[in-house]
């Protein structure tokens, strides 16, 4: 792919690499692509429905057939020159059937923010966790938040961490390691 800042995951179902969205050559992307692990060949996935083009969004695996995609920054046309904006919406997608469903969208936020590349999903509590940071200034900060998958209600879980946001040169992600 010619774009960066896409979301990615290794499928628990077929062990292939999937990517969504991203940014490149002054365009925001909303393609779903699959890399076959045994062939090193990319294939565009035909989705039924669409998610507006974006980057700086979070993706997490909800189940074997379901991923969640939250937030981001982009424009409905994909064109940077038309004035991008922040997204605060949550989508559920099945990369195997191509089904996409919008679960909810939050109102414009007082302080604009984008999110880390990954989210951690807790299906027992019906929450997802991601790192959030303002994308309207370079001296920024990261904060861990939880969001209710049903309605988008959020809660800040920790103090902030200083973060030098430098647009396409900035990257953060979130990982979870189960304690045995």
Question: Where are each of the predicted segments found?
Answer:
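Beta-propeller and closely related beta-sheet repeat lectin domains
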Residues: 4-9, 53-60, 115-120, 170-175
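Beta-propeller blade signature
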Residues: 29-41, 82-99, 140-154
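Intrinsically disordered, low-complexity segments enriched in Gly and acidic/Ser/Thr residues
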Residues: 120-167
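Short, conserved, GDST-rich strand-edge loop motifs in beta-rich repeat architectures
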Residues: 20-24, 69-87, 129-141
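Post-signal peptide N-terminal segment of secreted/secretory-pathway proteins
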Residues: 1-27
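Entry beta-strands of beta-propeller and related beta-repeat scaffolds
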Residues: 14-19, 65-70, 125-130, 179-180
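Conserved blade-ending motifs and adjacent loop-strand segments that build the rim/top face
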Residues: 101-117, 150-178
């Amino acid at each position: 792919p010619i774009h960066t800042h896409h979301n990615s995951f290794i499928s628990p179902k077929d062990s292939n690499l999937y990517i969504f969205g991203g940014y490149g050559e002054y365009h925001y992307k909303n393609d779903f692509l699959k890399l076959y692990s045994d062939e090193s060949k990319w294939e565009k996935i035909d989705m039924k429905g669409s998610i507006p083009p974006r980057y700086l969004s979070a993706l997490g695996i909800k189940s074997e057939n379901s991923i969640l995609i939250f937030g981001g920054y982009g424009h409905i046309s994909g064109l940077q020159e038309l004035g991008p904006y922040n997204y605060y919406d949550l989508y559920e997608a099945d990369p195997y059937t191509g089904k996409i469903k919008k679960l909810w969208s939050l109102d414009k936020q007082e302080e604009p923010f984008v999110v880390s590349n990954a989210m951690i999903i807790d299906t027992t509590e019906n929450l997802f966790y991601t790192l959030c940071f303002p994308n309207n200034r370079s001296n920024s900060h990261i904060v861990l938040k939880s969001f209710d998958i049903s309605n988008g209600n959020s809660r800040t879980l920790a103090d902030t961490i200083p973060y030098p946001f430098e647009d396409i040169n900035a990257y953060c992600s979130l990982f979870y390691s189960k304690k045995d």
